[in-house]
From Swiss-Prot:
It comes from Nitratiruptor sp. (strain SB155-2). It comes from the Bacteria. The lineage of its organism: Bacteria, Pseudomonadati, Campylobacterota, Epsilonproteobacteria, Nautiliales. GO terms for cellular component: cytosol. This is Transcription antitermination protein NusB. Keywords: RNA-binding, Transcription, Transcription antitermination, Transcription regulation. Belongs to the NusB family. The keyword Zinc does not apply. HAMAP family: NusB (MF_00073). Involved in transcription antitermination. Required for transcription of ribosomal RNA (rRNA) genes. Binds specifically to the boxA antiterminator sequence of the ribosomal RNA (rrn) operons.
Amino acid sequence: MATRHQAREAVIGLLYAYDLGNPEIKKFAEDILEEKKIRNKQREFALALFKGTVEHLDTIDEMIKKHLESWDMERVGHIERAILRLGVYELFYTDLDPAIVINEAVELAKKLGTDQSPKFINGVLDAIAKEVKNGSQKA
């Protein structure tokens, strides 16, 4: 049985494909999750994360852009962008503890990104989480 971490990793793959210009990925998301053996509750969890992130993508991207110091969104790698998008979605649209969201994102960055990815992901998501905690940003 797949874990939530594995479900999130599969969602990163879906978001990555979507970001590369494959909007058809939405139609095949369930099949792709089945291929990766993401089933039952974890499949529902993964689909909710993917669909929610895509649905709120414009708002999520604005939040990310606001916290990119000296960076353009286009300079952020596709994997890192997918991880940030999922992390921001979970920070704003789920009841998960921000520390868990950030830790999961950093672990995904360690596995899927470059050597610099974990620190970058941690910094951006931490800044966004602090803003959420202070109530100065509403989704």
